[in-house]
Amino acid sequence: MAEEKSKSSAMDAFVKLEKVGEGTYGKVYRAMEKSTGKIVALKKTRLHEDEEGVPPTTLREVSLLRMLSRDPHVVRLLDVKQGQNKEGKTVLYLVFEYMDTDLKKYIRSFKQTGESIAPMNVKSLMYQLCKGVAFCHGHGVLHRDLKPHNLLMDRKTMMLKIADLGLARAYTLPIKKYTHEILTLWYRAPEVLLGATHYSPAVDMWSVACIFAELVTQKALFPGDSELQQLLHIFRLLGTPNEEIWPGVSTLVDWHEYPQWTAQPISSAVPGLDEKGLNLLSEMLHYEPSRRISAKKAMEHPYFDELDKSGL
C-alpha cells in the first residue's frame, strides 16, 4: 500500500502550469517543482492499453537521454517519476530542464517581421547544432527526426539544445535495418525517401542542412507535401541523381524513372548566405550519404572561423 501511495504522490512534487506540446509519445507540460520553485518541462508518456509496465521505447529513450544529457547541447533529463493516472495505470513522467522557445518559433518570429536572422546568430546556432549532433553520433545515436520544432532554445542566451530523442536509436556497426516511417518530410534525406533500409549518421546531416538553409531564408528548403513531391523538390535544386553521382541509387526500393533535372547553383535557393556557408551547405547535401560531411568535420569548417566558440 505504501508503494501505491508513493506512486500517486510522485507528481505532487510539481504544479502543472500549462500544456506546451505533444511529443511523439505523450504530452509535455511546463511545470514548477514545489520544493524549489524551479520551472521544468514534464513529459508524460502515454502507455498503450495493452501494456503492462513501461514501454521499451520509453525505457530506450530514458537510457539514451541519461547518457546524452551530459552534453550542453542535448536537453537535460533531470529526473524520472512514476505515477498513476485516474484509471490506475502506470504513467511515467520525464522531468527535463525547461527552455523558453524552439527554433521553429524563433524562425517564425523573424518571418513575421520580415527581418533576417543576423548571420552571426545563424553561425552560432549552426555550430551548436553540429556540436550536439556530433556528440550524439559519437555515442552511437542517430536522432533521425531533427527539425526546427525539436531544437529548443533559450532566447536570452541563444543556447540551442536537441530534444525529442523519441525516435533516436543507437546504431551499432554494421548498421541495422530501420523502419523508414520517420522524420518530418521536409528534413528527410533522399536515401530515406527512396526506401533505403540501412541508415548512417548522414541522415541527420541532411536534416541539419535543411535547417541551415531555413535559418538563412526563413523558408523551408524542400517543402514537399508527399514523399514523391519531396523528392522532386530535391531533384529540381540538386539535379536528378544517377548511378554516376550516387552509386547504387537505382537499386533502392522506391527508385523509379524520374524527370531529368540539371543541378542549379545552391546560392539560388539560399540567397544571402556567404561563400563559406554555401560551401558547407553543399558538403551537407551530397546525394551519396558516405560523401556527406560529418557533424564533427562540419565544426572545423572555415564557415565557423570567425565565431567566438567560448561558452558554446
Curated annotation (Swiss-Prot):
ATP binds at residues 20-28, 43. Pfam families: Pkinase. The modification Phosphotyrosine is found at residue 25. The active site is at residue 145. Plays a key role in the control of the eukaryotic cell cycle. Belongs to the protein kinase superfamily. CMGC Ser/Thr protein kinase family. CDC2/CDKX subfamily. This is Cell division control protein 2 homolog D. The gene is CDC2D.
